[in-house]
Amino acid sequence: MIFIDNRQNKFDVTEELTKKLEEVISFVLKEEKVKEDCEVSLVFVDNEEIRGINNETRGIDKTTDVLSFPMIDYPEDKVYKDVYLEHEFDKCYFDGDELILGDIVLSLERTKEQSIEFNHSFEREACYLVTHSVLHLLGYDHMEEEEKARMRGREEELLGKLNITRES
């Protein structure tokens, strides 16, 4: 289940946008071989709120585009499909029958700024950031160059399969 919570009032959150982002989340989960019913929360905020969350949770007093809060601890250099296709999850990761993957906090204000900066659509930028964040919920990271290359490659592959291009 995908929960969407709009906590900002600077941008209209259309049904078209929420459906597209739900489609992106579902597609990434399917492509990453997530078989369980799962729970992902997507929270829309403005720059001020994401800056506060970034400072509170990471000690970085700076606006960012998206924050990911995975609920599952993955072994180092492993992602969901590397580990959990053959193993079961501990019950603490479930809410009833749903696997709790985590939360995505997306600044729609920063998304708009970046879409202008990178010269593509707001929808494309939002889809990219949500794809990026879902991959974080599944254990991907970009702290080391090798991890970064793996994650960036996977992002582009997934967006390509969804036909979401820089021209979109």
Swiss-Prot record:
Amino-acid biosynthesis among keywords: no
Coarse class of the protein's main subcellular location: cytoplasm
Any one biological process term the GO annotation gives: rRNA processing
Cofactor dependency: Zn(2+)
Domain of life: Bacteria
Molecular-function GO term, any one: RNA endonuclease activity
Signal peptide: none
UniProtKB keywords: Cytoplasm, Endonuclease, Hydrolase, Metal-binding, Nuclease, Ribosome biogenesis, rRNA processing, Zinc
Subcellular location: Cytoplasm
One Gene Ontology cellular component annotation held by this UniProt entry: cytoplasm
Cofactor binding summary note: Binds 1 zinc ion.
Catalytic class of the enzyme: hydrolase
InterPro entries per record: MetalPrtase_cat_dom_sf_prd (IPR023091), YbeY (IPR002036), YbeY_CS (IPR020549)
One Pfam family hit: YbeY
Sites where the protein binds Zn(2+): 132, 136, 142
EC number from the UniProt entry: 3.1.-.-
Function comment: Single strand-specific metallo-endoribonuclease involved in late-stage 70S ribosome quality control and in maturation of the 3' terminus of the 16S rRNA.
Family the UniProt entry places it in: Belongs to the endoribonuclease YbeY family.
Annotated protein name in UniProt: Endoribonuclease YbeY
Record organism: Clostridium perfringens (strain SM101 / Type A)
